A protein has these predicted regions:
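A structural boundary signal for the start of the first folded domain, especially the loop/turn
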Residues: 2-169
Length: 169
């Protein structure tokens, strides 16, 4: 009886361990609240953003990460950012309230990935306005650091229930 059970369980265990080994690793390793793999931020700005995101998490419980990647590797930014946010397990598991700001300068793409628990606050329209009105003018001027500062600042203002600063279109 025990031998039969082992004969049935061993192939299942082998399949499971193989699947775990084959699970895709995140495209970028989570090393902190600011993960600047594209090198768009100077160290003082990255440090200031890290402190601001830590304060946001202490005050609201929302875990937000800012990430830059040199390239999306041929993937669509929505797929890339969703995979990244899931692999990093951002936010509370119970509240699903993680938030990711992703910038891919090679493809000239920006995405705000919002956990389901924040979708009533960080609606698609809000995210679109932040990207188009707060960030894109800075990107167009060749200043990605200011774009990231403006976008993340607007996101934090929304999360703190303060109206985001309006920028003329």
């Amino acid at each position: 009886m025990m031998r039969r059970l082992l004969l049935v369980l061993l192939p299942l265990l082998a399949a499971c361990s193989g699947a775990a080994a084959d699970a895709p690793k995140p495209a970028i390793e989570l090393t902190g609240r600011v993960v600047d793999k594209a090198g768009l931020l100077d160290s003082a700005t990255a440090t200031a953003l890290t402190a601001r995101l830590a304060r946001l998490e202490r005050q609201t419980g929302v875990q937000m990460v800012i990430a830059t990647t040199p390239t999306l590797g041929g993937k669509a930014i929505n797929d890339y950012s969703l995979r990244l946010a899931r692999s990093w397990a951002l936010g509370s598991k119970e509240r699903n309230d993680g938030l990711l700001l992703l910038v891919a300068p090679t493809e000239r793409k920006v995405r705000i990935e919002v956990g389901k628990g924040l979708e009533t606050v960080m609606k698609d329209e809000v995210c679109d306005q932040i990207i188009r009105r707060m960030m894109m003018p800075h990107f167009a001027a060749g200043d990605p650091q200011s774009a990231i500062l403006a976008g993340s600042g607007a996101m934090i203002e929304v999360l703190e229930h303060r109206p985001a600063r309006k920028v003329a279109a």
